[in-house]
């Protein structure tokens, strides 16, 4: 599997792009006419040009059309993997240790991240996932994995900028999933697979069934269940500073000492794809009220879950340190995890959407008026870890919080037939919100041990207070004079005359280790609305030349407005050779999720807690 690491942070306010593409198209000779024309030339694309659909070889921009047979022929059932197999410019990787990226995989099209690609279902915009990939390029795009393969009639991939035609997300291109509209029949498949190493067992069950709604309607429903076990490609942890293999037999035998044994692995640092499972349902329905008027609706519901590991915290690292408790005794997280610990991250993703509308024609005018609602939510759980600042009172599992992306859109599209030209125009209104729900208190709370000497056992001059003297009288080994490990004279003797530093001065991290929870200070809802109007004209200038021009105006409540445009054309030199070219501009404003995303941890320079990291914009 290819893996592409996304490596930049959210750091832009506005993104503008000008694209120019040119390509020479050479078709097959007549000797292959029966096979090639049947399989390629007659593949029709809806995206790329308004008005009547065009074949992929006469489109002014490059479009790939994948049929249901193409999709079914791929061994994978995850839609991300299907597209990666069939579309060379589409890439998606597996990120074993990447916070939310473990559960919603970020993809690229034409080398640009997922939020630069507009995803459509039945030519309607698909809502974004709740995940903002803070570990990569800060992108936020739709979760294509929520679409079951059994629901697909065709997939169109426009590999060209189309922001002027379809909206600001279409910088890299457009992916349009057309759903099945069968009135009868159906399909059922069950797949099982495993890796040669004997792990990663996967089972997938998919099905589709079509029903007639009277004489003039259809209802097609598709469902998928998948379950994939984890793969393990790591080796037992062994580094010069700590080696698991060198530990005693008791360490290996004692289940409580195994950092990850509760999750079924004898390797303290698992490495590979995570455990995942999911149930997904999609429906598509339509009913013709007359020969010129049709009602339609489609939608989905999806639930999936997964879990993966973070990096191993070995005994003696910066997370596992001695602290001095209120009674003067010393405590270490090894009392919870004798062999160190590997945090385990769980994510539950819920996704649902509904689209409804009416389309028809009146004379030379066609219209399509629709409304849609989409929601995607991720709920996190963190286990097998601690909040170090809570000391011996820390729980070992946490609820760090939830992320929710919500969108509502109303859209009207029209086309008017001007004989050899088609005039398209329309408008849309989009309301979107992103919510960060705070985690449970223990996941972000700064406990007593986030500061040095929390129980005031020592004075500023490193002498013992009355409280310190009391715990010493009860048998504590407290030594306030042992306050530094510095050796300014470089004579092998520490400045305070004692080896090491007394645990009373230890300062530890704040929040659930591995993924601190969302605190109320950085939680909340981020909202905006926007509207857009566009016009598009296309047609045959001559028998050989097809041309297209589009203009779009978008206005955001938080990022102002912009006008973008595009021109494209296709020239047919001969039956075998054609030439196409396009030039366009694009504008993209950061999403509410990108503006509101937080990734904050508390650090302690000079012994005082300070929040650092990625904060909400504004």
List where the protein language model places each region.
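Outer-membrane beta-barrel transmembrane domain signature of Gram-negative proteins
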Residues: 343-354, 364, 373, 385-546
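Transmembrane beta-barrel wall of Gram-negative outer-membrane proteins
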Residues: 184, 197-339, 343-362, 548
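N-terminal periplasmic accessory domains that precede
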Residues: 79-82, 86, 105-107, 142-145, ...
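Extracytoplasmic beta-strand/coil segments of soluble accessory domains associated
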Residues: 84-128
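Short acidic/polar hinge/loop motifs at secondary-structure boundaries
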Residues: 124-159
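Transmembrane beta-strands of outer-membrane beta-barrel pores
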Residues: 192-196, 203, 225-229, 301-305, ...
């Amino acid at each position: 599997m290819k893996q592409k690491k996304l490596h930049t942070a959210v750091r832009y306010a506005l993104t503008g792009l000008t694209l120019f593409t040119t390509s020479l198209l050479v078709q097959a000779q007549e000797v292959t006419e029966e096979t090639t024309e049947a399989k390629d030339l007659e593949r029709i694309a809806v995206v790329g040009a308004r008005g009547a659909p065009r074949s992929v070889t006469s489109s002014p921009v490059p479009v790939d059309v994948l049929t249901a047979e193409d999709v079914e022929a791929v061994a994978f059932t995850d839609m991300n993997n299907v597209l990666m197999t069939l579309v060379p410019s589409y890439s998606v990787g597996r990120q074993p240790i990447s916070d939310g990226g473990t559960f919603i995989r970020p993809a690229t099209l034409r080398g640009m991240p997922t939020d630069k690609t507009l995803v459509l279902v039945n030519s309607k915009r698909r809502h974004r996932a709740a995940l903002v990939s803070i570990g990569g390029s800060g992108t936020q795009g739709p979760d294509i994995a929520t679409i079951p393969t059994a629901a697909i009639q065709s997939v169109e991939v426009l590999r060209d900028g189309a922001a002027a035609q379809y909206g600001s997300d279409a910088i890299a291109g457009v992916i349009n999933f057309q759903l099945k509209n069968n009135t009868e029949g159906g399909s059922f498949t069950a797949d099982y697979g495993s890796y040669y190493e004997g792990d990663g067992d996967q089972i997938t069950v998919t099905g589709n069934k079509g029903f007639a709604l009277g004489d003039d309607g259809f209802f097609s429903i598709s469902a998928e269940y998948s379950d994939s076990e984890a793969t393990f490609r790591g080796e037992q942890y062994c580094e010069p500073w700590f080696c698991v293999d060198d530990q005693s037999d008791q360490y290996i035998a004692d289940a409580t000492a195994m950092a990850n044994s509760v999750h079924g692995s004898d390797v303290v640092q698992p490495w590979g794809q995570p455990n995942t499972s999911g149930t997904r349902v999609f429906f598509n329905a339509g009913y013709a009220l007359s020969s010129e008027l049709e009602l339609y609706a489609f939608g989905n519901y999806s639930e999936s879950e997964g879990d993966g590991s973070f990096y191993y915290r070995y005994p003696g690292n910066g997370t596992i340190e001695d602290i001095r408790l209120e009674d003067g005794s010393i405590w270490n997280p090894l009392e919870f995890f004798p062999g160190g610990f590997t945090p385990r991250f769980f994510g539950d993703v819920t996704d649902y959407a509904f689209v409804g509308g009416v389309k028809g024609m009146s004379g030379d005018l066609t219209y399509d008026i629709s409304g849609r609602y989409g929601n995607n939510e991720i709920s996190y759980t963190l286990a097998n870890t601690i909040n170090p600042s809570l000391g011996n009172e820390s729980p070992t599992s946490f609820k760090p919080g939830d992320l929710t992306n919500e969108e509502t859109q109303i859209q009207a599209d029209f086309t008017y037939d001007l004989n050899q030209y088609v005039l398209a125009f329309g408008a849309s209104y989009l309301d979107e919100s992103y919510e960060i729900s705070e985690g449970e208190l223990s996941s972000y709370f700064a406990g007593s041990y986030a500061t040095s000497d929390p129980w005031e056992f020592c004075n500023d001059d490193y002498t013992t207070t009355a409280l310190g003297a009391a715990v010493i009288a009860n048998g504590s080994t407290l030594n306030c004079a042992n306050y530094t490990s510095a050796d300014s004279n470089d004579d092998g003797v520490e400045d305070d005359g004692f080896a090491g530093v007394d645990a009373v001065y230890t300062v530890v991290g704040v929040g659930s280790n591995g993924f601190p929870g969302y605190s109320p200070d950085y939680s909340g809802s981020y909202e905006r609305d926007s509207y857009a109007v566009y016009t598009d004209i296309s047609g045959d200038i001559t028998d050989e030349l097809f041309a297209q021009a589009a203009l779009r105006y978008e206005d955001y409540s938080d990022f102002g407005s912009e006008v973008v445009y595009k021109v494209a054309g296709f020239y047919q030199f001969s039956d075998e050779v054609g030439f196409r070219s396009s030039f366009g501009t694009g504008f993209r404003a950061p999403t509410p999720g990108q503006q509101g995303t937080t990734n904050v941890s508390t650090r302690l320079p000079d012994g005082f807690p300070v929040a650092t990291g990625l904060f909400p914009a504004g």
